Amino acid sequence: MSFNFKWPTFSDEFHTSAAQMLNSALNRGPKPKVIADDILVEELGMGTIPPELEILEIGDLGTDRFRGIFRLTYAGDAHLVLKTKVQANPLSKPNRPDIGLFPSSNASRGILFAAAPLIVPMHLRLSSVKLRAIVVLVVSKAKGITLVFKNDPLESVEVSSTFDSVAVIQKYLQQEIEGQLREMFREDLPGIIHRLSQKWLSGEAKSEKDKVKQKAEAEEPPARSREPTLTRSTSEPLVALETASAPGGTPRKSHSKAKKHSRSGASVADFAASPCQSPQRPRQSPRRPRHVAKAASTSAVPLHSEFSATHASPFDAAFPDIENYDPTYGLRPDDLPTHSGFSGLGRLAQRGLGGLKDLTASPVFDLDTALGAADVDLDGAAVFEDLNRQSDDEGSEAEQSQDAHSSSHDGKHDEGDATTDSDLDAVLHDVGDDVSDLDVQERDNLVDTSIDYSRFGYPPASAAFSDAHELTRASSIIFDDQPQLTRKHSKRGSVSGRSSTRARRPSSSRSDRSACTSSLRKREEAEVVYETIPAVGGGIVTRPRVYHIASKVQPPEVDWDDEDTARPSQYGGTPSTRTGTTRFGSDYGSATMGAQSSRTNTVRGIHDLPHLNSAFVSRDGSEESLIDLPPESYHSSDASLPHALDAERSSVSGSDSRRGLTNPTSRESSYRDLSSQDLHWDHSASSTAPSSSQSLHWDMHSRNDAAARTVNVKAGQNAESNSGLSFRKNKSANHQRSITLGGGGGGGFPLRRPGEGPGMSATPARTRASAAASARSRPGFITYATSPPGDSSGWQRSPPLRASSDRDVAFSTSPGVAQDMLSISPFRDSSLHHGSPRETSNVAGAYASASNSPYTSGHNKGTQGAGAAPTHLSIDASAHFLDLVKSNHTLSPFTRSMEHFTVRSAPVTPGWQTASGNVSVVGSSAASGTGTTSGSSQTGANAKSGKAGSDKTRSQDHLSVGHTVAEPKTHCQADSAAPSSGLPARRRRTFQLGGSSSRDDTASNKPNNTSTGQGEDSQDNSAAPGSDDYGFARYAGSGPQPFRASGSSASSAITDSSSKGNRLGSKDLRRRSRPGSMGPPSEAARLSALRWEAIRE
């Protein structure tokens, strides 16, 4: 198809209008300084040569519309002449400010330039425009012509100007104008054509359209005028509340009056109830998000007036908002957001938004105004004024507090339900608490408490911020110093401050509520902290800060009633795993946890019972204890005990002294745990070895035994007095936990290193490695039983995971020790003392001194490497980690800094066991009580190679513990061997928490080493830094050192040398590898990481 287009000369009128449009367009916006005048169109000629159009496609053709795609080619004689004035500035800038007063140097040389700005007229002519474009042309009788260029149409244009004689300027102008023309064709011309066409083509249609539009506009204003109120009311819970809730307005007024008068919670409650009752308010939730409220109250004042007007006859116009529905409703930026629905109303009543309070506060507004005020309050400013102005805050605050309480306490945030009991309750509360409420409210205003993150799964249960009861329970277990209180409060408001996010507002102390509130309050504090993390996909995530490792993360309390449902996996794996992780003080629980470095089998002695929890909690200062403890410390109580002993040694020794001090405490704490628990340790450490270690129940028959052990340790006696701890053997035969602490003569267990003290031997694992490990190897890591039940050597200290040091102790999983160190509180001793005889502490001291011994020192170093290097990751943290693993929280390093998770590189996965042993487990395990595990794995390896020798050595070690200095090597060696020989590599449910990575490697190495050279000197050298490699020292938390493992594959990576130097190197590596963590991940860590990767996939 072809067409002939007529291209007649355009009329003067067209040229004039086009010139005017061009003028306005050219002069719109700021002009460059160079242009000193307006740009005027002097000539505009459309030319006589028409463009060539080639029809490529016709998409729509009708009497009143056309859509086609054309190829437009134009090479005509159209031209455009513009004139303006430009400012020619001096080409040379004077060097001196006084240049104007004196002849310039240039002038003196006879060169004259403008010394001042010069305004020069300028003409610019554009002609010879060549266009080649693909054009989409849409002609509509109603909408005019739309012309769009699908490519860059401008091929060339000729630009001539006044300054053509200056080549530079000419070239510059050419480039600039071409660029601007291209932009014009792309952006401006289509708009110009469209507007022109609307004037010409759609004259009639436009007039009709205008009429319609005017008509619509005429109708709209009333709707709109009314809309702000109604629309707002619909979108604004406040208005809705007003109309729906207080159709007559009187009820509300009466309410507000009542509130004014009595401010009684009842009136507030009544008010809240009233809104709830209103048909329209079914959705209203007491907790309307504050941000929503704010949005709603954007025009608070207008709202007030509108409200009053509307309120006067809310139903006069039936539902004007509906009848005069504005389709743009919700799109108008000035309107309140509609998404809140009516939830804001309930929230208003419930929240300390000052809404109801405002009603009371500002009698003038009455209900309407109060609603408006509430809206404003939602905005926040009005609320604050009102709150400050009136103690009305009390009412709304009460609601808010109640709201918070109900949400946190009930763990439910039913929007409709919010106004009910909890509202009333809150109101009642609030009446009493208005001061605290007010404060809370202000705080709330600052922080949008109204938003309950818990309903979004935030913070994660692992974050200990969740509102869920279960989470709260766990959190209370973890964080709660007052477990009972927490439990009392549906665990939701855990004293630990894990109470629901909403619990932020302090509520008056009321029996239930006060506990809840206190926990809430704690939470509040915790909640105040929000952190912004880069999201993996980009952007950022802002969420309440979740404290991990060194934070208040403590082992979630196991619901003793449902031990298996206590999230054992969280703790490490075996069902019994969780048992130990009770809320006992961090010490005990931690120790328990720690003992099983994996949370696997935490000591679950009698004291694991909830009632014990509180005791332990008090002992630990539960909130701090786990937090304070390093991972190892959490891992095992028994570890803790040795840790405490080692710690005592440590405390004696200078370098270890800090750790040691802490350690003694820790150990003592462990001991204390033992004794306080009557040393009923279901030590996970032991149990760690057996997956059902839970059953491992060290029945330390008496604190006396513990004391005796302590005494023994103090004495440094070799005596393996039965601490009266009989270890009920774990379910796994592996653990010869049945051997009483004092009892097992056969395995190295009975052999208690002198000074080991019953406490040391008290722990089976500890017995096996306990004395040795605790005194000499990583004190904290002594784990019970890595060896099979029958294998006394297995019971001997597990490979000296942490043989090396007090530091080990310090970082040992032993809750006390590690905790001390972490807590930085001088010692957990005091808490340790809670349960156990002071002697324990003394024992710890003795051990600490032993630790100080050279061998200890070496161990300490090793320990430190592993212990110090390890981040303080508590079992709790490990549990958290598991929680995170299982939760939808990404563990990606982008989301959470790894520095907080020692376990990050070596995820704590249950069942870490490699041929080399529980390498991964060992490090952490050893350090954590997983040491037991490491013992286990070592035991496995060692058992394979030199079980008997190991046992012997271990026994020797135990004896030598007393002589820590004297027989560190032997001890370590024995330790290592004992576990190795004692027990086939047993699947330890220990998690390698960063601290023990090196230890892990060592552990695995050690088992192998033990196999190959059970008595390897390096192991023996447990006392010596080098020997630590093989001794507990390797597990001691010495830095991730390359361990010399005889054959441990995991160890081999780090196995390079057992010398302290290696250990240190390993430590350094580990540190390097995970900065916040322990150091380069141990082999175990690596394995763990691989496993983690697999899990992720």
Swiss-Prot record:
User: Which of UniProt's keywords are assigned here?
Assistant: Lipid transport, Lipid-binding, Membrane, Mitochondrion, Mitochondrion outer membrane, Transmembrane, Transmembrane beta strand, Transport
Q: Can you cite an annotated GO cellular component? A: ERMES complex
Respond yes or no to whether keyword Nucleotide-binding is given for this record. Answer: no
Location(s), subcellular: Mitochondrion outer membrane
Quote the PROSITE patterns the UniProt record gives: SMP
Compositionally biased spans, kind Basic residues: 252-263, 284-293
Show the stretches that span the lipid bilayer: none
Question: Which HAMAP family does this chain map to?
Answer: Mdm34 (MF_03105)
What does the entry's free-text domain comment contain?
Lacks alpha-helical transmembrane segments, suggesting that it resides in the membrane via beta-sheet conformations similar to those predicted for other outer membrane proteins and porin.
Q: Which family does it belong to?
A: Belongs to the MDM34 family.
Protein name, as recorded: Mitochondrial distribution and morphology protein 34
Q: Which gene encodes it?
A: MDM34
